[in-house]
Curated annotation (Swiss-Prot):
GO biological process terms held by the UniProt record: adenine salvage; AMP salvage; purine ribonucleoside salvage
Record localization: Cytoplasm
Classification via InterPro entries: Ade_phspho_trans, PRibTrfase_dom, PRTase-like, UPRTase/APRTase
Functional pathway: Purine metabolism; AMP biosynthesis via salvage pathway; AMP from adenine: step 1/1
Enzyme class, first EC level, given as a word: transferase
UniProt family annotation: Belongs to the purine/pyrimidine phosphoribosyltransferase family.
This protein's name: Adenine phosphoribosyltransferase
Listed GO CC annotations: cytoplasm
Catalytic activity: AMP + diphosphate = 5-phospho-alpha-D-ribose 1-diphosphate + adenine
Length: 170
């Protein structure tokens, strides 16, 4: 399936000079959405995944149904202040400042096999912060699954020891 045909380009969003890759049109297409989940399921079916970790917020959209298909649990990585129990937190750099991601301390038992899913790999900051969040849990990071990778932003370089699967590259 040609996923690029289901992803809308929005020039100058969220600011001038940015070409935004809008996945809402992919989400609206039942065949496209099914294809994404089925493709990731096929790619990871034999990997004995225990937990799919979805990064807020679009990682939730793909991560929960993928976890279901793989017979795995789903774990959300959230923005600050959204998780009610004890957390691990990781700050990461933005273009102008920093942000933080959080995960419950008991999200994945030690030794669990974990797959991280999100919609987009751009600079790699969010993905790298998520990998760092998982480290104190002593789980095995099997890899990352992304719908889109913006190759010109070199996000893979921040994940040098991780398997990365991107369904679409720009």
């Amino acid at each position: 399936m040609d996923l690029k045909s289901l992803i809308r380009d929005i020039p100058d969003f969220p600011k001038p000079g940015i070409l935004f890759r809008d996945i809402t049109t992919l989400l609206q297409n039942p065949d496209g959405l099914r294809y994404v989940i089925d493709q990731f399921t096929e790619d990871y079916r034999e990997q004995s995944i225990d937990y799919v970790v979805g990064i807020e917020s679009r990682g939730f959209i793909f991560g929960a149904p993928l976890a279901y298909q793989l017979g795995a649990g789903f774990v959300p990585v959230r923005k600050p202040g959204k998780l009610p129990a004890a957390i691990h937190a990781q700050e990461y750099e933005l273009e102008y400042g920093t942000d933080r991601l959080e995960i419950h301390q008991d999200a994945c038992p030690a030794g669990s096999r974990v797959l991280v899913v999100d919609d987009l790999l751009a600079t790699g900051g969010t993905a790298a912060a998520t990998a760092q969040l998982l480290a104190p849990l002593n789980c095995t990071l099997v890899g990352f699954g992304f719908i889109i990778e913006l190759t010109g932003l070199a996000g893979r370089q921040k994940l040098p020891d991780c398997h990365i699967n991107a369904l679409v590259e720009y």
